Amino acid sequence: MQTRNTFSWIREEITRSISVSLMIYIITWASISSAYPIFAQQNYENPREATGRIVCANCHLANKPVDIEVPQTVLPDTVFEAVVKIPYDMQLKQVLANGKKGALNVGAVLILPEGFELAPPDRISPEMKEKIGNLSFQNYRPNKKNILVIGPVPGQKYSEITFPILAPDPASNKDVHFLKYPIYVGGNRGRGQIYPDGSKSNNTVYNATAGGIISKILRKEKGGYEITIVDASNGRQVIDIIPRGLELLVSEGESIKLDQPLTSNPNVGGFGQGDAEIVLQDPLRVQGLLFFLGSVVLAQIFLVLKKKQFEKVQLSEMNF
């Protein structure tokens, strides 16, 4: 009987430990993941809205620059580089989810024309593989191979991200034509200010939800604050919760107004978007151009030779 109770107790403890670990994993994963471009796919069918705005800007509120470099023209069924540059001051530190300071991560979303896609590994040259490093790109959706996402990755190592892109071949894909196409890119550095569910992260400013007198500021054991605001007109109390990692701008006894900042702005990152154009060139046009240029060069050569021959004839007639 005692042995059976012992086994039952062990089984209950193991089950409880697994449940707690699973809950911690889910909570931690959700709080971290929702701050980067790669996880916009959980909430948006298409990362680019009809207005042209990339949805990552809904969570990363600060505007920062981003740049993209692609060739002016590419031939069908060839691999080329799309280099996304996400510049920022490498000395900056951001507030992490645990309230501590840490290095910034970066992420990007690349929206290619229909038919363009990530190049398969066997088509990527050793030189290009060296530029790519250990990055692992993903499709935004299984059926959207022309939209690629990456991140979060260490910003100090990958402030320039090289995407290996395979150009389509109109000969095998009738939906693709030899035209000029737009390419759109979005890139962020640092954590977002708002999660997809609308809640704030600890990487943004917290404002007072009511006006009045700050009667109490309680520092919580695991970090963060509880600020009690008393409305002087009716005595109603409002408690604002400040997460860990933020610096307070107010003190007890201070009179504040509605929406007045209670904390400084910890955000040192931001999101930016840009675009570029690329021409899918017909090889026959290139061959025709080369033939035309060759014809012009040959014509010039024959003209020079003819001129010299004419000058020799004139010279011989004058001597005669």
Curated annotation (Swiss-Prot):
UniProt GO BP: photosynthesis
Co-factor note (free text): Binds 1 heme group covalently.
Predominant location category: plastid
Claim: Nucleotide-binding is one of the keywords in the record: no
GO cellular component: chloroplast thylakoid membrane
MF (Gene Ontology): electron transfer activity; heme binding; iron ion binding
Annotated membrane topology: Single-pass membrane protein
Residues holding heme: 36, 56, 59-60
InterPro entries reported in the protein's UniProt record: Cyt-f_TM, Cyt_f, Cyt_f_lg_dom, Cyt_f_lg_dom_sf, Rudment_hybrid_motif
Top-level taxon: Eukaryota
Cofactor or coenzyme needed: heme
Keywords: Chloroplast, Electron transport, Heme, Iron, Membrane, Metal-binding, Photosynthesis, Plastid, Signal, Thylakoid, Transmembrane, Transmembrane helix, Transport
Secretion signal span: 1-35
Membrane-spanning ranges: 286-306
Function: Component of the cytochrome b6-f complex, which mediates electron transfer between photosystem II (PSII) and photosystem I (PSI), cyclic electron flow around PSI, and state transitions.
Family to which the UniProt record says this protein belongs: Belongs to the cytochrome f family.
Subunit architecture: The 4 large subunits of the cytochrome b6-f complex are cytochrome b6, subunit IV (17 kDa polypeptide, petD), cytochrome f and the Rieske protein, while the 4 small subunits are PetG, PetL, PetM and PetN. The complex functions as a dimer.
Protein name in the entry: Cytochrome f
